[in-house]
Amino acid sequence: MNISQKIVSVRGTQIGGEQPCICTPIVGASMEQILSETEEVCRKRPDIIEWRADFFKDIYDPQKVLETALAIRKIAGEIPILFTIRSEKEGGNPVPLTETEKIELFTEVCKSRLVDMIDCELLYEEELASLRQVSKEYGIRMIMSYHNFSSTPPKEELVQKMLQAESYGADIAKVAVMPASPQDLLVLFQATQEARSQLSIPLITMSMGGLGVITRLAGWMFGSAVTFAVGQNSSAPGQIPIEDLKEVLHIVQKHMFHG
């Protein structure tokens, strides 16, 4: 399949091209913390910033969420913004919202066009179609994701999750798992490579924790389009400081492509 079919372009950033994108999370609890963190992160020039709104203490107030999104946009400029409410079940911070209220908030954020992408978990199966319709209408790219913080499921199951995301209309499929052994890392890499050959959309995969660090450094070689790095504060175990990640990617690519 032509690689151009697998590229998603957001504000000029190519997701799914030859180079992996670096995404850095924003995890502040207050608007003040979020904006301070955004300024610090943007100075380090990530390709994408992810606002983990499940850490925002005022997430129950849609107006405050939109005000904060606007303030983030003003700082981020043309850096693409990914809006995420990670569920507690999939490793997120507990939030005082029902599943319906979360979908309503995603909808309002899409309508505001203050962000470029949203990440919605595959577990919202019934709501995904209507949210996909809204995101398309307002030009917001949609990542559909699966996170397992306890284990690494078999390769076939991981590939199926990514195929499921594409069948639901995702622009990008994401899988994150927890390894218990180096063998689990191979499972993740094999699933990534296999899904890459079957999907017509970009995919993002990683193993978490210290053992999974290698997947954040080398996942792009198997087909993962984005890797997550720490700008100021981590949103998941095993994330690497953005400076270190950029340096390692530079060294590996320099010797891979230039001998």
Curated annotation (Swiss-Prot):
Q: Keywords assigned by UniProt? A: Amino-acid biosynthesis, Aromatic amino acid biosynthesis, Lyase, Schiff base
Q: Which residues form a coiled coil?
A: none
Q: What is its EC number?
A: 4.2.1.10
Q: Does the keyword Flavoprotein apply?
A: no
Q: Which sites are catalytic?
A: 147 (proton donor/acceptor), 174 (schiff-base intermediate with substrate)
What pathway, per the record?
Metabolic intermediate biosynthesis; chorismate biosynthesis; chorismate from D-erythrose 4-phosphate and phosphoenolpyruvate: step 3/7
What reaction does this catalyse? 3-dehydroquinate = 3-dehydroshikimate + H2O
Q: Where does 3-dehydroquinate bind?
A: 50-52, 86, 216, 235, 239
Going by the record, the broad EC class of this enzyme is lyase
Alphabetized GO MF terms: 3-dehydroquinate dehydratase activity
What GO biological process terms are annotated to this protein in UniProt? 3,4-dihydroxybenzoate biosynthetic process; amino acid biosynthetic process; aromatic amino acid family biosynthetic process; chorismate biosynthetic process
Q: Which Pfam families match?
A: DHquinase_I
Which NCBIfam families is this protein grouped with?
aroD
User: Subunit info?
Assistant: Homodimer.
Q: Name the family.
A: Belongs to the type-I 3-dehydroquinase family.
Q: What does this protein do?
A: Involved in the third step of the chorismate pathway, which leads to the biosynthesis of aromatic amino acids. Catalyzes the cis-dehydration of 3-dehydroquinate (DHQ) and introduces the first double bond of the aromatic ring to yield 3-dehydroshikimate.
Protein name (database record): 3-dehydroquinate dehydratase
